[in-house]
UniProtKB/Swiss-Prot annotation:
GO terms for molecular function: 8-amino-7-oxononanoate synthase activity; pyridoxal phosphate binding. It catalyses: 6-carboxyhexanoyl-[ACP] + L-alanine + H(+) = (8S)-8-amino-7-oxononanoate + holo-[ACP] + CO2. Substrate binds at residues 27, 34, 139, 344. SUPFAM superfamilies: PLP-dependent transferases. InterPro entries: Aminotransferase_I/II_large, AON_synthase_class-II, PyrdxlP-dep_Trfase, PyrdxlP-dep_Trfase_major, PyrdxlP-dep_Trfase_small. Pathway: Cofactor biosynthesis; biotin biosynthesis. Homodimer. This is 8-amino-7-oxononanoate synthase. Catalyzes the decarboxylative condensation of pimeloyl-[acyl-carrier protein] and L-alanine to produce 8-amino-7-oxononanoate (AON), [acyl-carrier protein], and carbon dioxide. It comes from Methylorubrum extorquens (strain PA1) (Methylobacterium extorquens). Keywords: Acyltransferase, Biotin biosynthesis, Pyridoxal phosphate, Transferase. Pfam families: Aminotran_1_2 (PF00155).
Length: 383
């Protein structure tokens, strides 16, 4: 068969890119130099960033940097092998012990990222003949892990406990095992799952529950713990990596069966050491941990929005083009607030996702609120 130029790889990519461009959905990487105190530089412009998940500003904390530097000098830049070979460094083992204690669990397992953790957990626990029930607004990696498991996967309406009960009643009887997937804090809406009700249903229907705590660790009251508590090291802890906290038998099983752990290089020792020191700070400086939520609530009160439930506040715009235009207008005023568009959020719900940090001050929060009142009065109302 002779080559068809119109069917080339580049032609395919160009056609798809043109479609994304036409619908204002093309993504581009923008070089951003983050600094301390919520500072960022992009395109030669100094900005105040409200688009970072470093909720406590610990990525630039001198104590965290010192811990990483010491581990870097002692253990080298990388782990050098998978954890089951020689990549299980002393900082990793120490971090797992501390994470388990923080979560009130017997053991913990650190992965290369939160995404990798969720790719590995569900397939290690359930498979064909089993059932997964997942909140429709769960993170992409929860859905990816569910798909890889080959279990029957059913979405339930966001935070809808009544529908979850209906689906459990309908499907649980024919499934060997059932796993419920949700988030403590939802990453694009900033709201929280009704965990007491979900955990009660899980008990009633003999189901297991995994809670993704990527955006909640250290910055919201955890409330009731789930049997499976996963999260990241890259947000509140200012480092990089993911983890699962659970019982010792569950962690032992995943050590053998989670493919995203077994077949990848271990986390760099410096990342583990940084996260370990950051966790110490979270536990010993509660006033710092409380600040992001307090600032988020100051912001929502100023704009007359529903009271923030977490450090994440969505400002709903609607059309992707309008969200991009508002983001650009804010950048011209010195604020970095990135537009979130489909498929990350549903069509027609493009937004600015405003993330608050202990590194922000009240003046910066108030200035952003005033800019939004002026630029997008239809999306906010002054309180």
């Amino acid at each position: 068969m002779s080559p068809n130029p119109s069917n080339s790889l580049d032609a395919f990519a160009g056609e798809k890119l043109a479609g994304l461009e036409a619908s204002a959905l093309r993504r581009r990487l923008a070089v951003t130099a983050r600094g301390p105190e919520a500072a960022a530089e992009r395109g030669g412009r100094s900005l105040v960033s409200f688009s970072c998940n470093d909720y406590l500003g610990l990525a630039h904390d001198p104590r965290v940097i010192a811990a990483a530097t010491e581990a870097l000098a002692r253990y080298g830049a990388g782990a050098g092998a998978s954890r089951l070979v020689t990549g299980n460094s002393p900082p990793l083992a120490a971090l797992e012990e501390r994470l388990a204690r923080h979560k009130g669990k017997e053991a913990a397992l650190v992965f290369g990222s939160g995404y990798l953790a969720n790719l590995g957990i569900a397939p290690a626990l359930v498979g064909a003949g089993d059932l997964i029930l997942i909140d429709e607004l769960g993170h992409s990696c929860l859905f990816a892990g569910a798909a890889m498991s080959r279990a029957q996967t059913v979405r339930f309406a966001h935070n809808d406990v009544a529908q979850l009960r209906t689906l459990l009643a309908e499907h649980r009887g024919t499934a060997r095992r059932a796993l419920i997937l949700t988030e403590r804090v939802f990453s694009m809406d900033g709201d929280r799952a009704p965990l007491p009700e979900i955990l009660a249903l899980a008990g009633e229907y003999d189901a297991w529950t995994l809670v993704d705590d990527a955006h909640g660790l250290g910055v919201v009251e955890p409330g009731q713990r789930a049997p499976l508590e996963m999260g990241t090291l890259s947000k509140t802890l200012g480092s990089y990596g993911g983890y699962l906290c659970a019982s010792q038998p569950v962690i032992d099983l995943l050590t053998s069966r989670a493919r995203s752990l077994v077949y990848t290089t271990g986390l760099p020792p410096a990342s583990a050491a940084a996260a370990l020191t950051a966790l110490d700070i979270v536990e010993t400086e509660p006033e710092r941990a409380a600040r992001p939520l307090a600032l988020a609530r100051r912001f929502t009160a100023r704009l007359g929005l529903p009271e923030a439930m977490s450090p994440i506040v969505p400002v709903l715009i609607g059309a992707a083009e309008a969200a991009l235009a508002l983001s650009t207008a804010l950048e011209a005023r010195g604020f970095l607030v990135v537009a979130i568009r489909p498929p990350t959020v549903a069509p027609g719900t493009a937004r600015l996702r405003v993330a608050f940090s202990a590194a922000h001050d009240e003046g910066q929060v108030d200035a952003l609120a005033e800019a939004l009142i002026e630029l997008a009065p239809e999306s906010v109302r002054a309180g």
